[in-house]
């Protein structure tokens, strides 16, 4: 009885039957005929991973011109602690590596991700974790991600080794309609990272932040020339550009265009 309008679905877990009422294409066309539609069941927790293991480094790789879509949520959860709250990471203690990313980067250097369309993934669209440096994420369209659009996050600042992203660039991307499943998210999320540049991005239609600067001992991230609009649509205590934590110092924010 709860299935009463187009776009809704219901699972009968006892009989193993999924009921789905197709969404309305337009007032004139009505609901999409289900026999003409396409049903996709995600089975991968991550589509592509740039990762350094031992002496084999992930460097000088270009990922361009791809459509990346349909991952699971990977049983993702919020990271613990202020430095990562709002970022999704694998379920602790379960041996999982990924949580629904289209692209996961760990230990990558001098890589380029440009001109891709990333949409309808279960978790973060692009997850840049731990040591990553001098990578460029440019000119991608990212939409309908289950969590964050692009996440740069460190894992440990009490260590002489740089276990955090630094000197990366996120530029000229269009990020919109993310946070489908997790609402405490941002178009671009930074936590425990240093010297990254977030510039010339269009970020819109987000349930929470446009850009979020989490707890950081380092600072020195540059946020500039971004257009941010229609954010904070489903949650409170947030902002188009949000910064908080124990040491939110040294960041530069300038020339942000705001509309709504």
Where are these regions (language model features)?
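Extracellular polysaccharide-degrading/modifying enzymes targeting complex plant/algal/animal polysaccharides
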Residues: 1-107, 112-115, 159
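Short glycine/acidic-rich loop motifs that flank beta-strands on beta-rich extracellular proteins
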Residues: 72-78, 100, 122-128, 146-153, ...
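Surface-exposed acidic, glycine/proline-enriched linker/cap segments
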Residues: 84-100, 159-178, 183-185, 245-260
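Active-site-proximal structural scaffolding
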Residues: 96, 106, 119, 130-133, ...
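Active-site neighborhood of glycoside hydrolase catalytic domains
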Residues: 190-240, 244-260
